[in-house]
Amino acid sequence: MKLTIGYVGLSHLGINYAIASAIKGFNVVCYDDDKNIISSLKKKKIPFYEKDTEKNLKKKFKQFKFTNKINDLKNCDLVFISRDVPTDSNGKSNLLEIKKLIKKIVKIIKTECNLIILCQVPPGFTRSIKWPSNRLFYQVETLIFSNALERALFPERIIIGKSLNKMNKKYNFFLKKFKCPILEMNYESAELAKISINIFLISSVTSTNILSEISENIGANWLDISNALKLDKRIGKYAYLKPGLGISGGNLERDLETFRNFLKFNKIYENYSKNIKKISNYRKDWIYIQFKKIIKDFKSIKKIGILGLAYKENTNSIKNSPSIFFIKKISFNNKFKVNAFDPKIKKLLKHKNINICKNSNDLMKNCEILVVATPWKIFKKINLNKFTNIKDVINQYNLTNFSINRKKKKHIGMGN
């Protein structure tokens, strides 16, 4: 069966899922009203950093049509709505633009086209769309920044929200190419399943961070404890047991805010989500708390070096990044000169007072306090003993190969 797949909204999500569709053998039409994104993709350039994505775009380029003409979607058999839904500073979604976009799309696609909502929307959204229910679906995406294409190509399962009708043949043919269990349920169940996945992740991250801090305070070692937890079948080896700096990236925050609204509306456990958010914000302060302890001992310190600006390794996204959170905290004090290096971030438009170094070596030579804010693998190779100018290291991710003479320098890790 020959199918043409359309993607509307060339976000991180849309581009990776479109490339996955091409790898599975389908021709793909990619639409976005942003001419700069279309121009970039036509030149085989991805507007963000993601492992293997650009390489596979080049391999499958002949199967793509990139366009900002909405009518080019007319002959698609499946159309995925994959545009980012914007959020405010609290994580609340603004659905106005996505609703307008869908209204435009349903006016031009053919009547037998399958319309699939792929972006993050609250329960009840998909059912409200005016399109024949036997061709209207919600597909749960479980994209992970830094591993997005692999997740799109090899999902553990695919969760589909649908009406009571049988699964559409064309859509079913497309889904079976991914060779994983397909879980069918009603629209609201699928929409809530997406939120449920993230709330479980958030709860796990939050519990890990609390227990890790207790470990620090009582002299326990969280790494030893986490190894024991992974061997418990009720928890498992893939659980989020590495302590971190709160919830970042934007997607988890969005679902936490949706979850909070449901709790408030139903008047149940309203403080649960509020407390999670408080703990997350407190954890984002971890670097700053350690920093304040250090400058009490070394009042002459002026040079700060930050290794890593992205909110996690293998991405260039800085949304809700702990390092940016720290930069905001110290930027009011002109006493400090701040240098930063990240392998995928070359400039900070909103923080022009931060000097971006060309490499880690330049940064290390020009700092007295070193903060390891993102656990990039290349940072593990750094030998701190070469840099006598560094007095203290805040290394919350406990990069195990960080060579350091602990007698000469303080080395502050997380969870131990």
Residues covered by each model-derived region:
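Structural/interface elements that position substrates and couple domains in central-metabolism enzymes
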Residues: 1-416
